[in-house]
Amino acid sequence: MLRLPDNFESFTDARKAGFMKMKEHKDNGGKIVGTYCSFVPTELIIAAGAIPVSLCATSEEPISAAEAHLPSNLCPLIKASYGFALTDTCPYFYFSDFIVGETTCDGKKKMFELMNDLKETYVMQLPSSRDEVALDMWEKEIHKFWKKLEDFYGVTITEEDVKKAILLKNAERDLVLEYLELGKLN
């Protein structure tokens, strides 16, 4: 049985609910992978039988905790993200089996380096150009991540698993687009 963080009672009801939902999932044998940035191929996480959870900074609340480890002039998004990890106040980070990030900026690279001391953190190398070499590099990164998931969870991810996950994520994207289209209505 997993424990809740020591500071659980000080959380808002919404944050407590998030913790309880994640704890229930983990207590039932569920797998959770925390992700930073939309470049992480969540389809592979789903194909591995895990739930991808988006991690980010939702408030300035934990920035002061992060500034004990990061420069104060660093991006507030990075400081808040790292602060949530340090303070055990994000249910999705707390219950993630491991974290996946990417190299969109130097600040995130440093954050992931430090974050690896808190929880295993896998960093995907994001190409910085849009040519054939970059595409080849990204394809290799995706295959390395595929292998990481298989090794970490002791599973085999098949092409069929990936195809099913792609269909699921595409259906989700279509629904989000439909929702956003509602904003055009009078």
Predicted regions and their residues:
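An N-terminal assembly and electron-transfer interface module characteristic of large anaerobic redox
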Residues: 1-186
